[in-house]
Amino acid sequence: MTDTTLTELLERNARHTDSLPADHFADVQDGQEPAVVSMTCSDSRVPQEGMWYVEAPGWLFTPSTIGNQVWDRQDGEQIVDGSVLYPLVETGTEVAAVVGHTGCGAVTAALE
C-alpha cells in the first residue's frame, strides 16, 4: 500500500465517522442480532450495504469470499464456512442469502 493510498483510506474513514451522529451505534453497542447473513463475492464492485439498502448498523452480517463460496474443508469434510455459520448459530440470524454477480472471474475460472 502506498503512502498516498493509506492517507486516502484514513481520510475516507474520518469523513465517514465525522458524518455519523454520536449515537449511531447505540442500538448495537452490546451485541448484534442481524436479520440476514449475506454472502457475496469479495469483488470490489459488489457493495453489500448498498445492494440491500442498509441504513443502520446491525441489520446485515456481511462476509464475502472469492466466488461467494459458502463451503470450507476441515479434516477432509465439506462444512459450512464459519463466516456464514457464526451469525446463524451465535446471533440468532434466521436468513442466509448467497449472492453471485455478473462477470465473476472466480466462477468463470472454476467452470473452465
Label each PLM-derived region with a short phrase.
Residues 2-78:
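Short, conserved "active-site rim" segments that organize catalytic pockets and cofactor/ligand binding
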Residues 58-112:
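Short HxH-centered metal-ligating active-site micro-motif
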